[in-house]
């Protein structure tokens, strides 16, 4: 009989991880492979067999929801917290207190920059207009306001891009001086304009924080790490476990490294580089794929059995994402069979598609506004739910859907467009300036995001598209994996 955790028997791959005593262990866990059960099994083994006091175990997850869920499943007095809660606890233990801004404060400042702060600053308005290839500056403010009003959706996407740039700048421990170095490395007009705009936003953001007496979450992580380096108190942890490690940023790594250096704790991190989709929050996939570069005496183990998807789907999705050589190679397996799990649906009649699918359905979209074109008097949308006839369907962005699953999944608007899938604005090469990762494959994160969309289903995934505007991802699936694809016309 295998090792039993919460009434479930672990498979051989999961058992091997639970019993491993490496100093630094990376667990590569595929989608739907039971990684949470493995984490619980590991903690149970450390407490019951290795006799480690639960107070000396630190478990980190990325959301309050996931930490609360893990606490309930463990039923032990273990520190289970987010990185932000960890940083706060370190600072409070050392009698250091700050006022912390809301998590969306940077987004707010960036939005205000484009829609208010910029007014009255003609040179900055000219700079922004030039970035969008507009060079007529008679009555600059009037021209700028008209441009923003007419191109609201595009401006909204560029707001996200500038937020992402500044977020990566801070999470990768760059500073104001870095802008000088960046300018030496780029020569194209548009990229230099982007840097100039980003610099203005960065200065405004930092001044806003200072004038309001605030620090942001990234500053707080750095303060916690500096407190430890300067001899501050830190609980004597013997074992650290981090879930969703593929979403860790460089400064979070620096914080963990400072704790390990002070306590000599062992560490196990769990995640899936195929599902590294939060670069806009500062995550650095290099920490995952080059784990041995950052942690000494390291070892890699994999969980390659998946319990959610069919073999046909997981094989197709896996080969698709591994086109990028930067990803860790895996041979994902499943005992489930489904001959044609990927349905490419030509047309935009969501109503008809909802009528023909049996079972529960989750609806996904790449962009928040994708749902609008599918709504009518019979299909309504509110608070992440679509109502059709007497049924209600959950509807999320692909980012929001990570970790979720459903019998069947519909992905909207998988077309070749600036705001399609892949989203061509988000995948801007200038982000490489503020990234420590060497992952330079075109649309690498969009490719991983598409993988996440494909693997939410337990049965079939339906890609709603336009046969005259096929996404490059759909074209690739048809070319390379036609055996597992069915094309529907509605």
Summary of predicted features, one role per range:
Residues 1-100, 455:
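P-loop NTPase Walker
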Residues 2-19, 23-28, 187-286, 305, ...:
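Conserved helicase NTPase motor core
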Residues 26-27, 33-39, 297-299, 305-390, ...:
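Helicase P-loop NTPase motor core
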Residues 56, 61-153, 397:
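Conserved P-loop NTPase-based nucleic-acid remodeling module centered on helicase motor cores
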Residues 79-82, 216, 224, 391-399:
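Conserved two-lobed SF2 helicase motor
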Residues 107-208:
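Coupling/switch/interface segments within P-loop NTPase motor domains and analogous charged loops
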Residues 250-340, 484:
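Conserved RecA-like helicase ATPase core segment
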Residues 401-467, 475-476, 484:
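Conserved helicase C-terminal RecA-like lobe
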């Amino acid at each position: 009989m295998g090792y039993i955790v919460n009434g479930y028997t672990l498979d051989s791959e999961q058992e091997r991880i639970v019993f491993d005593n490496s100093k630094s262990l990376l667990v590569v866990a595929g989608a739907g492979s039971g990684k949470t059960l493995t984490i619980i099994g590991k903690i149970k083994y450390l407490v019951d067999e290795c006799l480690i006091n639960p107070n000396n175990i630190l478990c980190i997850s990325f959301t309050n929801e996931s930490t609360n869920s893990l606490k309930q499943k463990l039923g032990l007095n273990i520190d289970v917290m987010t990185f932000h809660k960890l940083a706060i606890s370190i600072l409070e233990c050392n009698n250091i207190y700050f006022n912390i801004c809301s998590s969306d404060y940077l987004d707010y400042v960036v939005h205000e920059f484009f829609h208010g702060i910029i007014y009255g600053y003609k040179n900055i308005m000219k700079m922004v207009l030039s970035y969008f290839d507009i060079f007529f500056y008679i009555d600059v403010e009037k021209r700028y306001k008209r441009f923003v009003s007419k191109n609201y959706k595009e401006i909204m996407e560029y707001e996200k891009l500038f937020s992402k740039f500044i977020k990566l700048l801070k999470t990768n421990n760059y500073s104001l001086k870095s802008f000088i170095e960046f300018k030496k490395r780029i020569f194209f007009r548009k990229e230099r304009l982007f840097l100039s705009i980003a610099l203005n936003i960065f200065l405004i953001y930092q001044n806003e924080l200072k004038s309001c007496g605030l620090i942001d979450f990234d500053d707080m992580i750095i303060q916690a790490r500096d407190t430890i380096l300067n001899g501050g108190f830190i609980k004597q942890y013997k074992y650290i476990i981090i879930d969703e490690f593929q979403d860790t940023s460089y400064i979070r790594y620096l914080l963990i490294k400072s704790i390990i250096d002070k306590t000599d704790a062992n560490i196990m991190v769990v995640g899936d580089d195929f599902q590294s989709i939060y670069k806009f929050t500062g995550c650095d996939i290099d920490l995952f794929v080059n784990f041995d570069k950052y942690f000494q005496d390291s070892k890699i183990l994999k969980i390659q059995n998946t319990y959610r998807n069919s073999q046909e789907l997981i094989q197709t999705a896996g080969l698709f994402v591994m086109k990028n050589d930067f990803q860790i190679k895996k041979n994902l397996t499943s005992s489930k069979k489904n001959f044609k799990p990927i349905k490419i649906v030509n047309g935009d009649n969501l109503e008809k598609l909802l009528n023909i699918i049996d079972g529960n359905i989750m609806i996904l979209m790449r962009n928040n506004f994708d749902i609008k074109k599918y709504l009518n008097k019979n299909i309504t949308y509110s608070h992440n739910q679509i109502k059709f006839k007497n049924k209600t369907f959950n509807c999320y962005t692909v980012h929001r859907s990570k970790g979720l699953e459903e019998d069947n999944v519909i992905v909207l608007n998988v077309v070749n467009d600036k705001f399609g899938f892949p989203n061509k604005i988000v995948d801007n090469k200038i982000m490489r300036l503020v990234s420590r990762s060497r992952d330079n494959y075109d649309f690498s994160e969009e490719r991983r995001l598409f993988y996440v969309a494909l693997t939410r289903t337990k049965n079939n995934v339906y890609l709603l598209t336009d046969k005259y505007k096929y996404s490059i991802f759909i074209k690739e699936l048809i070319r390379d994996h036609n055996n597992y694809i069915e094309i529907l016309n509605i």
